[in-house]
């Protein structure tokens, strides 16, 4: 009798050990806005731990509080950088910047007080979405939807342009963060 009870008990234990537990999604606990305001200097955008790239918006820098490229108090975008430092308190990287545009643009950063200066655009917090590895917003000046994503080695950008014959993407190799600038860069055309 003991043997008969013992076998079903072992069978039940083995069946329980074989079932796989559903892994918990810890990304639901991430608040990507922590540290993005005041003196936090934390980067906002699409990145993953120890990733090669950090894609995200770059605002018009006003003080050293913008040294990560983003400050929650600001709703301007001058481009989407592919390398950012986070939490350092000093500007660096952000050297490769893409800015989707529609129509005639004035190259350069411009100033937040003058909408006709530079190629910058405003965005709305209502349109902004950020999660681990993902960032999205809408450029109000151009009507362009922006989505950025990152993996450990690669970043991807997707731009949804309105119907236009005059849409483009500006590649800014002179971009830098705050007082930091690229000093020696260029483009070499390898083929047609």
Q: Where are each of the predicted segments found?
A:
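Bacterial N-terminal signal peptides
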Residues: 8-16
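Accessory carbohydrate-recognition regions in carbohydrate-active enzymes
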Residues: 20-192
